[in-house]
């Protein structure tokens, strides 16, 4: 094994670099590989992921290599600034080199992440998660360099294009939020706060995860589950036949369970378990109260060190809302209009429940169940029957036609491109009068074993839009977890919620791949600084 060290300091005589003092080193073990093999990205072939030949070893090797390259590239840029600051062009000598290294890292990282999500047997957690964290740290290096930050601060942006000005703004905002305007003592204090926040957040998330998995309740009575939809029964069943039981209630299916469970005590029990996750009501070793207060205090301290009134005010630097006042005003206006209607709806729901035999006042664990019953009574709205109107293929076809018409696009399936699973399809996106694709979209719609489950799905950019990557089109993966078809004659049927998810994520994917900018820093989801 060849051992590559990341995070190693350079032995140069130059002013103290505070970000290096807080940077932690780490080690990546890379399989032996010749330099020629890594001259071009071995995970891609002909502009597309080389699915047939991708292995975990190749993923680790390639991502590790580009991690090294990126960190080395940031240091090279710093050295250039130190040695000849007055001879450098902002974009030719600073932005372009960072883009070249950054885009290669992002493209490799994105592909490896997609493979981890769609098949964590082929790319297991232990092989991916440590690399993911290291890539995340490496990517932040360019925003933690005082030399790079100060070089950006000293530039006259008046003659730059709008896109170039946005790139400069991105670096300035990120540098400011990383404490690069602070003096040495405050910078060191801010670094300690940042590290403490990361530690507290990790502990908080771990306790939430462990605590959430503690709750379980077994139902043996089929009368309770007789109105449960098939997908809920399948998610709960402890036997091969989801209709026979027994059934296990967990917090993973809490929302849907509250909608369908007719037993108020069972609803309350499950709701209370969800409410008490990692709280003072549970085991002491899983109580998050102290971590929550620590996170709040550290956030306040970080904001004050940077000169903000609160963490919320600091957060607005990277949000389209612009200010806390704008958010408060918007929420106030919405509340003023919506509250009378909400009160009217709650009164109506209470009356309906009482007329249907319910005694007492509706509580939070009652509302999902009675809301569903009321919709069924008033509008004959049954989510399960509505699914018959939304077979996946029909919805996707209609969505593609709508998007094509609205944006003057042509979206065609590319069956010749190999994918990681037969369910996954590839689509090329063209301008109507152009034969060269603007972008490529992988759509992997159905849940399956070894595929990471997220209810709302996710969009992963596997190759960003950036001039540094050349003429190859950007690529994104739209990964969803809809129920798989039972057979070729039984299509996957979507709920209205599923349809909303598909529309939302498809739009997010288009935002990723249809950028027309030159620079990764402001491409795709980077429209807002992060």
Task: Identify the role of each PLM range.
Residues 280, 286, 293:
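Substrate/cofactor-recognition hotspot
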Residues 284, 288, 388, 392, ...:
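Alpha-helix N-cap/helix-initiation motif
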Residues 515-530:
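Acidic/histidine-rich catalytic neighborhood
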Residues 162-163, 167-169, 191, 196-199, ...:
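Active-site-proximal, well-structured secondary-structure segments within enzyme catalytic domains
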Residues 28-55, 65, 394, 398-410, ...:
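C-terminal, non-catalytic "cap/extension" segments appended to globular domains
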Residues 34, 469, 473-477, 493-496, ...:
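Alpha-helical segments
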Residues 300, 307, 403, 484, ...:
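Active-site recognition of the HExxH zinc-binding catalytic motif
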Residues 2, 10-12, 19-227:
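N-terminal helix-rich structural modules
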């Amino acid at each position: 094994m060849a051992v590559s060290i990341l995070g190693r300091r350079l032995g140069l005589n130059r002013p103290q670099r505070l970000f290096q003092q807080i940077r932690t080193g780490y080690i990546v073990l890379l399989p032996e590989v010749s330099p020629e093999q890594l001259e071009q990205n071995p995970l891609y072939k002909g502009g597309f992921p080389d699915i047939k030949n991708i292995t975990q070893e190749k993923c680790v090797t390639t991502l590790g290599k580009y991690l090294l390259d990126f960190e080395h590239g940031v240091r090279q840029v710093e050295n250039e600034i130190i040695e000849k600051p007055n001879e450098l062009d902002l974009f030719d000598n600073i932005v372009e080199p960072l883009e070249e290294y950054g885009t290669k890292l992002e493209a490799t990282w994105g592909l490896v992440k997609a493979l981890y999500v769609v098949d964590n047997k082929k790319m297991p957690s232990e092989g991916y998660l440590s690399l993911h964290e290291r890539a995340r740290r490496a990517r932040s290096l360019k925003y933690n360099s005082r030399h790079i930050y100060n070089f950006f601060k000293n530039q006259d942006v008046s003659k730059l294009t709008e896109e170039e000005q946005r790139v400069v703004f991105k670096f300035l905002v990120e540098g400011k939020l990383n404490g690069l305007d602070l003096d040495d003592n405050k910078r060191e204090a801010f670094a300690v706060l940042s590290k403490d926040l990361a530690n507290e957040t990790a502990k908080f998330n771990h306790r939430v995860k462990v605590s959430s998995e503690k709750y379980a309740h077994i139902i043996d009575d089929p009368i309770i589950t007789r109105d449960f939809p098939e997908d809920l029964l399948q998610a709960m069943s402890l036997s091969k036949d989801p209709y026979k039981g027994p059934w296990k209630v967990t917090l993973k299916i809490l929302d849907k369970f509250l909608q369908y469970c007719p037993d108020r005590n069972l609803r309350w029990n499950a709701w209370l378990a969800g409410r008490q996750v990692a709280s003072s009501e549970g085991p002491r070793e899983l109580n998050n109260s102290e971590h929550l207060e620590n996170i709040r205090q550290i956030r306040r301290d970080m904001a004050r060190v940077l000169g903000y009134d609160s963490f919320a005010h600091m957060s607005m630097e990277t949000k389209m809302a612009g200010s806390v006042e704008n958010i408060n005003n918007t929420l106030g206006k919405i509340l003023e209009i919506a509250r009378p209607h909400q009160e009217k709806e709650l009164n109506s729901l209470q009356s309906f429940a009482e007329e249907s035999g319910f005694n007492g006042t509706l509580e939070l664990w009652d509302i999902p169940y009675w809301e569903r019953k009321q919709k069924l009574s008033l509008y004959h709205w049954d989510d399960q029957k509505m699914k018959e109107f939304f077979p996946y293929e029909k919805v996707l076809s209609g969505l593609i036609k709508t998007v094509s018409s609205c944006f003057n696009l042509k979206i065609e399936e590319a069956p010749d491109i190999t994918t990681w699973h037969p369910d996954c399809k590839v689509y090329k996106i063209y301008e109507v009068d152009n034969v060269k694709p603007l972008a490529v979209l992988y759509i992997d719609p159905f849940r399956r074993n070894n595929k990471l489950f997220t209810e709302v799905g996710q969009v992963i950019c596997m190759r960003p839009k950036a001039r540094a990557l050349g003429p190859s089109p950007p690529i994104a993966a739209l990964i969803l977890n809809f129920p798989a078809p039972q057979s070729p004659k039984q299509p996957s049927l979507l709920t209205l919620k599923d349809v909303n998810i598909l529309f939302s994520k498809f739009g997010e994917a288009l935002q990723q791949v249809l950028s027309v900018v030159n620079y990764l820093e402001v491409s795709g989801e980077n429209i807002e600084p992060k």
